[in-house]
Amino acid sequence: MSLATLQGQSLDFAVKHSLDDLLKNPVRFRPAVVSSPSVPEGTYTVLNNPKQSTVSRKSFSAPTSPTRNKRSGSSSQEYKKSSGTRGDGANDFVDEDPAFIPPARILFPEEKLSMEWDNIMPNAPGLVNLGNTCFMNSVLQLMTQTPPLVQYLLSGQHSLSCRMNACVLCRMEQHVARAYPNKGTKRASAFKPSGIQSMLKVISSHFRPYRQEDAHEFMRYLVDAWQKSCLQNHKNLDHPSRETSVVHRIFGGYLRQQILCSVCKKPSNTYQALLDLSVDAKGSSLADSLKHFVHAEKLTKQNKYRCENCKQLVDASKQMTIYRAPNILTIHFKRFTFNGFQSSKISKQISYPESFNLGPYMSDPNCSCWYELIGVLVHAGGSTRSGHYYSFCKSSNGVWLKFDDDFVSNSSIDRVLNQQAYILQYKRKSTSSSKHKLNTENTVTKTSNKKRRKISF
């Protein structure tokens, strides 16, 4: 008998007995319990994820009124580090409504934030494409036309105290200084955004030079890196203190998730910090997308909710609303869907207004919170790894400009409103009633001895 035949028989014998052993002693699996959907580097939390379990998660809830009721059952993460707060060394959760937790330290006073342009600035210049960097250029142009951010960076406040060797916010400060080199009316010449490109690996380790990336993903990691820069001189800060950084003052807000028991009608409120809103692109308008975002989901059948008040699994409703509105509202349309290793794009037109009231989508529907459009980022192409990004931005003199890498041209509001938008940037209108405050359903109490609870996962 040949050696090959013996080896073949040995292999057949081993396979047969391995299968027999497996059938006699099968591997027993159990459902995994995860704290959030899997995403790159574990930074961001997917909102309204239809596959997300609502029963088997560790969680906590916040009081539903100023009387600070006892905790009731909840089934999702809340008041958690949002995108933009990673890297500060804290994974603790707090047990209370953000209205009841005064910050131990104020990093950036709210009254110093300037929402309107202090001066008419020269129009920002174009940015040279360094090789598949249109995703970066289009985001940088949006940020370079955001009044509170630009005016903070031009003041040079951050670099005066920064001690980081590789600081993304310092590089952004330098970038803005190049875009607005003087207070004259002459536009600067197009330049290479090499300072930001050289920080791609710092912004996120999976970014590669000269490779097309997703503009929204880059934006979120960029803002996240700015937040790290804001916190680098401050250790062991509580959540409320971290969220008084200039980054959160500009882009930050809160979501509220409310689960309402169908039996006892007792609500369970949980809160989460936000830096942008990602909404579905299935409707025909921004209003459709926002309505879908705040639409109440039924928890029933295999997805019932365990109510701590009723001490049993019950039918319930779950609704996400905006609890505190940000000063700069960034809205991302989820145009890309992924199936295995391929992605496809929802290319239909979605209408959006020049101004709108966010009030109907807030936790208190009686609130009035008006926004005006200041930027639109567009993706032309069929997937995140191909195509081209460009943006439309409203300049300090009210003129709309199109930024297509190093080419800058005048535009109009009619043309701006007729784009296949991927990202919208809105600025909160300055009125006496639209200050950066928590939703009025709760009253902020300025006490320093509030009990805080940390829960580790």
Swiss-Prot record:
It catalyses: Thiol-dependent hydrolysis of ester, thioester, amide, peptide and isopeptide bonds formed by the C-terminal Gly of ubiquitin (a 76-residue protein attached to proteins as an intracellular targeting signal). Its EC number is 3.4.19.12. The keyword Phosphoprotein applies. Residues 125-429 form the USP domain. The modification Phosphothreonine is found at T64. SUPFAM superfamilies: Cysteine proteinases (SSF54001). GO terms for biological process: protein deubiquitination; proteolysis; regulation of protein stability. It comes from the Eukaryota. The active site is at C134 (nucleophile), H388 (proton acceptor). The keyword Phosphoprotein applies. PROSITE patterns: USP_1 (PS00972), USP_2 (PS00973), USP_3 (PS50235). PANTHER family: UBIQUITIN CARBOXYL-TERMINAL HYDROLASE, UBIQUITIN CARBOXYL-TERMINAL HYDROLASE 36. This is Probable ubiquitin carboxyl-terminal hydrolase 16. It comes from Schizosaccharomyces pombe (strain 972 / ATCC 24843). The gene is ubp16.
